[in-house]
């Protein structure tokens, strides 16, 4: 535990092309070894591919994908009397966004296409259509929470 209180959350600057903070967080999540320019190129190329394939505004498709991936509930391990229970809890708004982005990027990295821009575009399109690995991850998380609803009274 920190001795000097909590540090304030740092605000992310919006990305240069779409002027959107969530897109900036996606770029930061894609970034490896501090190579932000590469991450931006991947993200913007993926958005261009999405725009071509759907004919819709890429930002709309991205927001739809995010809404389909962000979890409402998750389970948290809580130890009570020597037993560990998986206690379902509601997910805070900022954590929902973080988990959604993380799951989309992780699912993209595991896809089979040759280039990351194609993998990311494919995963975002799948998520917008309520299919794909990121949406499956959300459904699994919700199933876990539903299965452990009996332990909800142990909430924090």
Swiss-Prot record:
Pfam families: Ribosomal_S7. Keywords: Ribonucleoprotein, Ribosomal protein, RNA-binding, rRNA-binding, tRNA-binding. Coiled coil: none annotated. One of its GO terms (cellular component) is small ribosomal subunit. The keyword tRNA-binding applies. GO terms for biological process: translation. SUPFAM superfamilies: Ribosomal protein S7. The keyword tRNA-binding applies. GO terms for molecular function: rRNA binding; structural constituent of ribosome; tRNA binding. It comes from the Bacteria. CDD domains: uS7_Bacteria. NCBIfam families: rpsG_bact. Belongs to the universal ribosomal protein uS7 family. Part of the 30S ribosomal subunit. Contacts proteins S9 and S11. One of the primary rRNA binding proteins, it binds directly to 16S rRNA where it nucleates assembly of the head domain of the 30S subunit. Is located at the subunit interface close to the decoding center, probably blocks exit of the E-site tRNA. This is Small ribosomal subunit protein uS7. It comes from Clostridium novyi (strain NT).
């Amino acid at each position: 535990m920190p001795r000097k209180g909590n540090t304030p959350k740092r605000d992310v600057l919006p990305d240069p092309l779409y002027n959107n903070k969530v897109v900036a967080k996606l770029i930061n999540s894609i970034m490896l070894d501090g190579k932000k320019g590469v991450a931006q190129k991947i993200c913007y190329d993926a958005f261009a591919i999405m725009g071509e394939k759907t004919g819709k505004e890429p930002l709309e498709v991205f927001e739809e994908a995010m809404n389909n991936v962000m979890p409402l509930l998750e389970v948290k391990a809580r130890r009570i009397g020597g037993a560990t229970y998986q206690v379902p809890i509601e997910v805070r708004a900022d954590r929902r966004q973080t988990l959604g982005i993380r799951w989309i990027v992780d699912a993209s990295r595991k896809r089979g296409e040759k280039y990351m821009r194609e993998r990311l575009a494919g995963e975002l399109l799948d998520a917008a259509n309520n299919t794909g690995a990121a949406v499956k991850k959300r459904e699994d998380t919700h199933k876990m929470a539903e299965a452990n609803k009996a332990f909800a009274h142990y909430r924090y």
